[in-house]
């Protein structure tokens, strides 16, 4: 990602600095943290404060309940929950809160992440989890920012700049590839 002209975390309309985490990241084990680095990279780039917690739906259900209560009290706007294997954490969180939950299924285990993906996308009626692709931590960060942009105008502008940058990168790649193709013809 390229740096852009946004230098502060202030909301453009109000001028207030956002001092609380807007995004919470939940992961069931420290072993999975390295697969989520891109979330932090994206949120830092867009100047969105976040926090991360180790929460396991099956191994620490009481902690999961406390975690959700705390997030609601803090005013967190989006939760990103990751998991591998049965990956019940995103669904459990979604069943206990009205805060939007983004699920990130992680590769691993016998089915190489397919069980995680299916667990997240097959949620029952009324308990949605916005599920990303396997190991799509980057897209989870972007999607969280898009949700936040509905409330925080500075993010909408930053996302527009980011999309323009993606477009420019494709154009640059096309020019380079076309040039190399002509040289080898």
Residue ranges, per PLM feature:
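Short glycine/serine/threonine-rich phosphate/pyrophosphate-binding segments
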Residues: 32-36, 61-63, 83-92, 111-114, ...
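Active-site-proximal loop->helix
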Residues: 40, 65-68, 95, 112-124
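Short, glycine-/small-residue-rich phosphate/pyrophosphate-handling segment
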Residues: 111-157
